[in-house]
C-alpha cells in the first residue's frame, strides 16, 4: 500500500506509464510469493515463482530509482523503499538457494496448514534477527 500511496502524488502525466508499472511490479512481488508458497509441493514451480518475485522486486527498485531521479520521491523515501526491497530480495535469494528447507515433502510429514510466517521465523538467513527466530 505504501507504493500506491506514494504514487498518488506523482504527476498526472505519469499515471499510465511510471505509476502503473511501479504499482504492478510491487503488487506482483507479493502475488508471486503467495503463488509460490502454495506450490511448494513442487520444488521447480516453487523456485520459479520465487524467481519471478525476485525479478519483480528488482524492477520495483528500478522504478524507485527512476522516481527519485525525476524528483517524484525524496531521497529518504527512496532509500527506505530500497532498504525494504533489499530485505525482501535477501529472503527470496535464501529461499531460492535452499528450496529443500521450504518445500513440502511427504516424508517430512509437513502439514498443509504450516504457515509462511513460522517458516520464515526459523530461517537461517542472516538478516533475520535472533529475536524473530525465537518466535
What residue ranges belong to the model's regions?
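Short, C-terminally biased terminal segments at protein or domain edges
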Residues: 1-135
Amino acid at each position: 500500500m505504501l507504493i500506491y500511496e506514494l504514487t498518488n502524488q506523482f504527476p498526472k502525466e505519469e499515471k499510465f506509464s511510471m505509476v502503473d508499472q511501479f504499482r504492478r511490479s510491487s503488487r506482483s512481488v507479493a502475488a508471486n510469493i503467495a503463488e509460490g508458497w502454495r506450490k511448494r509441493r513442487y520444488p521447480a514451480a516453487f523456485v520459479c515463482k520465487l524467481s519471478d518475485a525476485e525479478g519483480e522486486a528488482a524492477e520495483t527498485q528500478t522504478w524507485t530509482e527512476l522516481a527519485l531521479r525525476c524528483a517524484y520521491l525524496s531521497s529518504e523515501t527512496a532509500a527506505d523503499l530500497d532498504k525494504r526491497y533489499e530485505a525482501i530480495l535477501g529472503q527470496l535469494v535464501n529461499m531460492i538457494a535452499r528450496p529443500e528447507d521450504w518445500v513440502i515433502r511427504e516424508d517430512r510429514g509437513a502439514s498443509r496448514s504450516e504457515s509462511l510466517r513460522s517458516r520464515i521465523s526459523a530461517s537461517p538467513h542472516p538478516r533475520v534477527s535472533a529475536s524473530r527466530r525465537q518466535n
